[in-house]
C-alpha cells in the first residue's frame, strides 16, 4: 500500500486544521519554515508546552491559532486535553473530545497549571508504579510479572471510576487500624510524601511558565 507524503508547503495549503506536535525547543524553527505558506483561514493547533498564543501568532504571521495540552491517554481515546484560543472552538473541541475529554481554559495563565496536572502527571504516576514494581520484584516470586503489578494499579483505578467512589473512602476501606496498610501510609505521611508530590506539580507548572517567557 502506497503512503502519500507532502512537503510542508503542500500540507499548509491542503489542510483545514494543522496539528503542530513538536517539542517547545523546535517550535520557532518550524514556525519560521511554515509562515510563508499559511493562509488566514488555516487553523493551527500547537501542543507545545509554555509557548503562548501571542508568541505563536507572532511567529506564524497568519492563520487561526489554538493551544492544546493533551496527555498520553489520547492514544487510547481516554485523554484529557485543555484548550485555549480566541478563535471559534467547535471543530477543535470535536477532535479532542473524540480523543477523550476537552476542557476549555478561559485564562491562558491557567494552562500552565493544566500542563503540570494533565500533561505531566501521568509520568509522576508511572514513576510511582515503577518504584513499586522494583520493590515488589525483590519481594515476590519470580512468576509475578511487571504486567501483573501494573494490572494491580489498573484494576484498582477502574473500580474507583466505575463505582464513583471517593478515593479517601477507598483508602479507608483497605486499611485497618494498626494494620499493614496503615503502617505504610503513616510512613508516607511522616516523610512528607504529600508535600513532595505537591511540589513536583508546582515545579512542572513553574517550568511551563518559564517556557512561556523564553
Question: Predicted segments — roles?
Answer:
Residues 1, 5-83:
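Rossmann-like NAD(P)(H) cofactor-binding subdomain of soluble oxidoreductases
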Residues 6, 55-64, 80-113, 123-163, ...:
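Internal alpha-helical scaffold of NAD(P)-dependent oxidoreductase catalytic cores
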Residues 9, 24, 49-50, 108, ...:
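Alpha-helix N-cap/helix-start capping motif
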Residues 15, 27, 31, 53, ...:
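A general structural signal for well-ordered alpha-helical segments in protein cores
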Residues 65, 111-116, 167-172:
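Short pre-catalytic strand/loop immediately N-terminal to key active-site residues, enriched for Gly-Thr
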Residues 70-74, 115-125:
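Glycine/serine-rich anion-binding loops at beta->alpha junctions
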Residues 75-79, 112-115, 183:
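A short acidic, helix-capping loop that chelates divalent metal ions and anchors anionic groups
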Residues 148-214:
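NAD(P)-dependent Rossmann-like dehydrogenase/reductase catalytic/cofactor-binding core
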Amino acid at each position: 500500500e502506497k503512503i502519500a507524503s507532502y512537503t510542508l508547503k503542500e500540507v499548509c495549503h491542503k489542510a483545514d486544521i494543522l496539528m503542530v506536535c513538536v517539542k517547545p525547543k523546535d517550535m520557532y524553527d518550524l514556525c519560521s519554515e511554515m509562515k510563508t505558506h499559511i493562509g488566514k483561514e488555516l487553523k493551527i493547533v500547537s501542543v507545545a508546552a509554555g509557548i503562548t498564543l501571542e508568541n505563536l501568532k507572532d511567529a506564524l504571521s497568519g492563520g487561526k491559532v489554538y493551544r492544546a495540552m493533551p496527555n498520553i491517554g489520547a492514544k487510547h481515546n481516554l485523554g484529557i486535553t485543555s484548550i485555549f484560543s480566541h478563535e471559534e472552538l467547535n471543530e477543535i473541541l470535536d477532535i479532542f473530545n473524540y480523543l477523550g475529554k476537552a476542557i476549555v481554559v478561559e485564562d491562558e495563565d491557567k494552562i500552565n497549571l493544566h500542563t503540570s496536572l494533565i500533561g505531566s502527571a501521568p509520568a509522576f504516576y508511572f514513576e510511582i508504579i515503577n518504584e513499586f514494581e522494583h520493590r515488589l520484584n525483590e519481594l515476590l516470586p519470580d512468576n509475578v510479572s511487571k504486567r501483573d503489578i501494573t494490572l494491580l494499579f489498573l484494576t484498582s483505578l477502574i473500580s474507583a471510576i466505575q463505582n464513583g467512589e471517593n478515593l479517601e473512602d477507598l483508602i479507608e476501606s483497605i486499611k485497618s487500624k494498626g494494620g499493614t496498610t496503615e503502617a505504610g501510609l503513616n510512613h508516607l505521611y511522616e516523610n512528607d510524601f504529600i508535600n513532595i508530590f505537591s511540589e513536583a506539580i508546582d515545579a512542572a507548572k513553574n517550568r511551563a511558565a518559564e517556557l512561556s517567557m523564553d
